[in-house]
Amino acid sequence: MAELRKDPLSSSWVVVGYGATKSGSAGLCPFCPGNESLTPPAIREYKGSDGNWFVRCFSAIAPVFMIEVEEDKKAEGIYDKMGNVGAHEIIVENRSHTKTMSMYTEQEFLFLMDMYQERIIDLKQDRRFKSVQVFKNHGELAGSYIFHPHSHVLATPIVPSRIASEAIHTRTHYLQKERCLLCDIVNQEIRQGIRVVSINKNFVAICPFASRFPYEAWVVPRFHDAYYENLHDQNIKHDFAAIMLDLMRRIEQLANAYTIEIHTAPTVPPGDAHGEDVHIADHYHWHAEILPRDFRSSKYKREDEFQVISITPEQAADALKMQES
């Protein structure tokens, strides 16, 4: 049985004892139409007028986190551990086995957005879960071994370290300057322009100043909102779909494998990001991160300490802008 264990030196949590199993039968894609029996029952489906699904969500075949598990928090001397309570869902993004995100129509992307938002809102009702995040891996170098386009939804009893770090640093900035850190970053990036890949009325796509991967790009709202799931205005949703699809058409010309993450505010902020003086909605700012995985870092291997990349964000932004979208 898998469980969560806390590293006392870094305060990070790891899942131990997890053994993923291969999905489906030999030669069959479990996510393709007609193979629904190879997956758990659907939690939610969007269906067309013909009665066929075109977006489908179900519990992961080999979940990292499980709803039926108890928290069961325990201490072993100096060490802390707990059950891997949570949820792990798969969203099959469309019926096509070979369609990549750069090929999506705007309407297909909007339906996918709707499913993301529905599942985040639903899972956040469970008070055991402190964070619900959505991510997508494409390509084996990104850790995906089923080619059929799909995303993951993870609801966890602890806030992931990257989200926790963002919450802590955005709160610190807000307390010092009474402004949102990402709002300030967006304003500076637009003024300078050198790392901007594309821009529309409501969003900007940038290669971040301290990129961890070659051609890493973020899509950030030009307005302040902590919660991706709050995005309901249809004009704004169309702008998000347009800039994401434009960016993915550029990135897929340069990278065969990538991860997409939607960073939305946690339900319960980490301790250092919480206080009566300021609410997380004031300082956290949701955004999407696209992390290409094709490229090797230099010989320095302490990837948990420093990321070393071969191209500057400014060069990456120029290269992405040169790609046809």
Give, region by region, the residue ranges found by the protein language model.
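Gly/Ser/Thr-rich active-site loops/lids in small-molecule metabolic enzymes
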Residues: E229, D233-A242
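An acidic, glycine-/histidine-flanked metal-binding catalytic module
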Residues: M244, M248
